[in-house]
Amino acid sequence: MTTIIGIKARDGVVLASDKQASMGNIVEDKRAQKIIPITDYILLAGSGTVADLQHIAKILKTELKLRELYSRRTMNVIEAANLLSHLLYQNRFYLNPLGLLIAGPINSKEFGIYSLDGIGAISEIKDYFAEGSGGVIALGTLEAEYNPDITVRDAIKLAEKALKSSIARDVFSGYGIEIYTITKKGVEKLFLEAQK
């Protein structure tokens, strides 16, 4: 399990996760990548089984690349979310439970975040969302401090605070914080150490 967070800001979006991967009650990895770049401008974050996340991310990367080659245009996050939904539904009997956030540009001025469950149901995130074993803990901080006019810069601070809260209380979250931003400037990655 884990904690992943998505925050929609007025000038972009923020995805954040902890770095711990667990196998039962054992810490399997302290540097797990739970946010995966799908394209140069679309990111996928996942809670659940890391192998399933990596598998579905590889398929999504390939399918999006093929669609971009055939159509000779860049796919937006809405198209990526719909494709991901289809892939999850096709594989619904083979994957362990997953919680996913996909983020990226809708057009040249807007950015979006979509939540998907393990069988492909999609929800557009209009403000913020937290998923995983520590998600409910992170939601308390997000609900108390989110502002609809938040900037990406402030959303980074809010994501960090919410993840630190989750890491302090959830035994399946920990060992660092990874934050990505998507703005008109592109995708940027931050890594922050956190106390366990």
Swiss-Prot record:
Quaternary structure and partners: The 20S proteasome core is composed of 14 alpha and 14 beta subunits that assemble into four stacked heptameric rings, resulting in a barrel-shaped structure. The two inner rings, each composed of seven catalytic beta subunits, are sandwiched by two outer rings, each composed of seven alpha subunits. The catalytic chamber with the active sites is on the inside of the barrel. Has a gated structure, the ends of the cylinder being occluded by the N-termini of the alpha-subunits. Is capped at one or both ends by the proteasome regulatory ATPase, PAN.
MF term (GO), any: threonine-type endopeptidase activity
Propeptide residues according to the Swiss-Prot or TrEMBL record: 1
Entry-linked HAMAP family: Proteasome_B_A (MF_02113_A)
Protein's name in the database: Proteasome subunit beta
Sequence similarity: Belongs to the peptidase T1B family.
InterPro entries documented for this protein: Ntn_hydrolases_N, Pept_T1A_Psome_bsu_arc, Pept_T1A_subB, Proteasome_bsu_CS, Proteasome_sua/b, Proteasome_suB-type
Residues the record marks as active site: 2 (nucleophile)
Regulation: The formation of the proteasomal ATPase PAN-20S proteasome complex, via the docking of the C-termini of PAN into the intersubunit pockets in the alpha-rings, triggers opening of the gate for substrate entry. Interconversion between the open-gate and close-gate conformations leads to a dynamic regulation of the 20S proteasome proteolysis activity.
Disulfide pairings: none
Catalytic activity: Cleavage of peptide bonds with very broad specificity
Job of this protein: Component of the proteasome core, a large protease complex with broad specificity involved in protein degradation.
Keyword annotations from UniProtKB, A to Z: Autocatalytic cleavage, Cytoplasm, Hydrolase, Protease, Proteasome, Threonine protease, Zymogen
One GO term (biological process): proteasomal protein catabolic process
GO CC annotations, alphabetized: cytoplasm; proteasome core complex, beta-subunit complex
EC number from the UniProt entry: 3.4.25.1
Pfam families: Proteasome (PF00227)
Taxonomic source organism: Nanoarchaeum equitans (strain Kin4-M)
Keyword Metal-binding: no
Record carries keyword Hydrolase: yes
